[in-house]
Amino acid sequence: MKFSKTRIPYRETIRKAAEANYRHKKQSGGAGQFGEVYMRIEPWYEGMAEPAGLTVRGRDVYNLDWGGKLVFYNCIVGGAIDARFLPSILKGVMEKMHEGPLTGSYVRDVRVSVYDGKMHPVDSNDISFKIAGLQAFRQAFQQADPQVLEPINHVEVLCPEDLTGAIMGDLQSRRGIVEGMDT
């Protein structure tokens, strides 16, 4: 029999709302890179009301491969950021959701509302807004009381009666809850 180290499928999420902005600005001779994003992130749950105090212009719901959802709102008014840059901002957010800041685990059940930003007619491009979206999400996530979600499994343990005490002690030392015993 071969044993290997078990990879526990932790997830990360947030417990409160937070706002952040990030300006990506890089100049090196020719055309540079510029993109600025303002966003609010909140814990997401089914049946949640629209974002308070923001004008919603678009909403997309993404079922994440690792479980949970990302709800992405376009709340930009007045053309502060062209709509063509929103997919790049989303890519940056999704990239950061693949590796949360606490354990490097996937992030789930978050609502992101992009509500403002700035662009430059020459220096703004997709990579600038991807980086700005990723960094704004990272900053907001750290301010939003992040938490690690641990998996819960129901297991049935069969053992000889003389080992019952030792096995129960081991399970409880690992925060296991014994729901019943049969002999």
Q: Which residue stretches match the model-derived regions?
A:
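Accessory interaction regions appended to the cores of large information-processing enzymes
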Residues: M1-T183
